[in-house]
């Protein structure tokens, strides 16, 4: 009897297995390709973020403080310098840093007893931005002067918006929670009052009112020919006889200000990137109105 061969059946089975293996391999390859593509994109994004975090950041160039000015107003001859009331923090971007949005930057300050977190007093929805642009002959100028004709106050001089709009009535700002900006250098005009973006080559001063102000809120109709002006970091009302009076107090970050021999620490923290470090100890006595602290 003749024996039948089954080679054909075996060949078809092998072909089916082979096709199945090819299909499985194709599906696996597709999964691997998709996964590798996703991982590649994630790694690129992570790399960009890491580069941004490492390269970007803010550098604190220097910190300058201003004490109470000697009171040279009419009716006063005091020359005491008790507290630092204003801080000017000079900052620039790190080398290789991408643009830093100062409206999303925070300033952290601590005197060992209190820590404050400050944000920019301005933005597109703010009518009174604490923002000044251009080189100034006095970066601490918060000086106001009004004269009265018996009916109205006449504005003779206004201080820098970077200072006065931290506390000026109607701004809804709190000098104990906000900082201002003075633009010293900005070649590409990236620093605007609504969107202050710090780029390569830019230099700005962050203004912080660390001490209190005293404000006169009198009625000009009752103060004929009076003068209303600041005496350093205070508001003084000077009447026609040379007598001064002070009333309503505006609080700064550290109450009356920073006394002598006080250690201050803090950071200027951008939205991303390395923060700028603030650390200094004030002198044991204040002998000058303006002094470099860091």
From Swiss-Prot:
It is found in: Archaeal flagellum. One of its GO terms (cellular component) is archaeal-type flagellum. Pfam families: Arch_flagellin (PF01917). Residues 1-8 form a propeptide. InterPro entries: Flagellin/pilin_N_arc (IPR013373), Flagellin_arc (IPR002774). Keywords: Archaeal flagellum. Its main location: other. GO terms for biological process: archaeal or bacterial-type flagellum-dependent cell motility. One of its GO terms (molecular function) is structural molecule activity. The keyword rRNA-binding does not apply. The keyword Cytoplasm does not apply. Belongs to the archaeal flagellin family. Flagellin is the subunit protein which polymerizes to form the filaments of archaeal flagella. This is Flagellin B1.
